[in-house]
Amino acid sequence: MVVFAVLITITVVTSRASIYTGISGELASIAEFNGGEIQSGFDTVERAALGIQDYIGRLYSGQVTEEGDADLQQSTLYPGRALTSAAYNLEQFVVETARNTVKNTPEIKMLGVMFEPYQLQSDMEEYGFYVTMDTADTSIHIYDAYEGYAKEDSYRIPAGEGHPYISQPYQDGDGMVVAYGTPITYGGRVVGVVITSVD
């Protein structure tokens, strides 16, 4: 009897240790995989921000030629708002960059581009929008006021401190996401921020 009790105890302890090791290993693998996906999303957003930053630099240094700068064009996102050719071309570039990034990167649920007051154009205090994975082909969501995006940590911290921001994971719908914001700089100052939610 005592022998059976000892064998049962040894079996239970050994089984428990094996199960614990197996579960720990599986959870570590899942965490490593998820971490890799999140890092991939961050890298994609960094590339998008650097592409926008590079375009702004080329635009304002004259490397991107602007025909008809005196002609104002209607904003695609803000109906009734007239944009200079430079601002219009920048709008087209950032909208397509955001759309394509969301459509081609499954781990990115949302991507937005927001500018500091009067940085897209000298008579526009606010300019910000975001694209979601679900509506990338059909609609773009705009912010009507600077305050609408300026208070969000993913904008406020990169804009104010000049470095990327990563939130703690939070529940969004049926999954966990991480918010990420990275500054767009020109001439040594922050002119805007690219933000995203990474699955």
Model-found features: residue ranges?
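Juxtamembrane extracytoplasmic/periplasmic/luminal helical "stalk" adjacent to the first N-terminal
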Residues: V3-Y88
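Extracytoplasmic/secreted envelope proteins and their assembly/folding machinery
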Residues: A28, E46, V95-R99, E152-Y155, ...
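Amphipathic alpha-helical bundle/coiled-coil segments
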Residues: Q39, G148-E152, G181, S197
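Short regulatory alpha-helical segment in sensory/regulatory domains of signaling proteins that mediates
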Residues: Q39, G57, A98-P106
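Extracellular/periplasmic ligand-sensing ectodomains of membrane signal-transduction proteins
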Residues: R81-Y88, T101-H163, Q168-G175
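Solvent-exposed, extracytoplasmic
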Residues: V94-K103, V193, S197-D199
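Conserved beta-strands of PAS-like sensory domains
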Residues: D174-D199
